[in-house]
Amino acid sequence: TGDKLYFKGELTPASSVGIGTFTLSKKCNAGGNAMSLLFGDNFENQYSLQGKNYAFYALFKGCANLEGVSSDFLPATTLSNYCYCSTFENTSIEIAPVLPAKILATRCYQRMFYRCKSLSYIEAMFTTTPSSTYTSNWVYGVSSSGTFVKHIYADWDVTGVNGVPTNWTLTHDIVNSGYIIGKTGENGHYSD
């Protein structure tokens, strides 16, 4: 209990399989910075996934034992095609990591939180209008109630499986702080 395991590497995403998929046999949380899996020791100040299509495709797909993820786990502000497709599909997370990118790429968030039945909080800063081109079924099967925070300048109004989940409360991030509301710990990051 309380043990930590660290991963880093300089992995190259392969078309349609990304860098691989974790299998978790015990309940756990994911923390740190996912960019360390792509850039090794040079992950700090890396905010672009340009040229890294499928980067984190299905990274935790089907990991029902994944219960939480730190708010700053996915710091990329420049996305690539399919980069987060199915990343958390069928996990048990309650709070999504902050999604700071303002411009979406093709299928970047497709099925990202598909069937995450416990998910009830998403903070997504994109100003691109969500649609099947970018966010196909990204929130299908999430909790029937929750809070969705979007960028103050995001003027889109899309609800349902490709946008803000139906029946969720919608708020705006006035300061674009990247911190989460609810379960917070030191510096506003997720804690349990």
Which sequence ranges carry the predicted segments?
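Extracellular/surface-exposed low-complexity segments
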Residues: 143-192
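Surface-exposed, short loops/turns at beta-strand junctions within beta-sandwich domains
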Residues: 1-2
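A structural signal for leucine-rich repeat
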Residues: 136-141
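Register-specific detector for alpha-helical tandem repeat solenoids, activating on a conserved position
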Residues: 57, 85, 110-111
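Structural signature of tandem-repeat unit edges
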Residues: 5-7, 15-53, 61-80, 89-106, ...
